[in-house]
C-alpha cells in the first residue's frame, strides 16, 4: 500500500478541474 502525498492529491485535483473545464467548453461549443 503506497501512501499518497499532498502533492499527488493536489496534482490529481488540478488535473480533474482542467479536465472538467475542457469538457464543459467542448460541450458548450458542440451545443452552440
Curated annotation (Swiss-Prot):
Highest taxon of the lineage: Eukaryota
The keyword Cell division appears for this protein: no
Cross-referenced SUPFAM superfamilies: Subunit XII of photosystem I reaction centre, PsaM
GO biological process terms held by the UniProt record: photosynthesis
InterPro entries: PSI_PsaM (IPR010010), PSI_PsaM_sf (IPR037279)
Any one Gene Ontology cellular component term annotated for this protein: photosystem I
This protein's record includes keyword Chloroplast: yes
Protein name per its UniProtKB record: Photosystem I reaction center subunit XII
Organism whose genome encodes this protein: Chaetosphaeridium globosum
UniProt gene name: psaM
Amino acid at each position: 500500500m503506497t501512501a499518497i502525498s499532498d502533492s499527488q492529491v493536489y496534482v490529481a485535483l488540478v488535473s480533474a478541474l482542467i479536465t472538467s473545464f475542457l469538457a464543459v467548453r467542448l460541450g458548450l461549443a458542440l451545443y452552440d
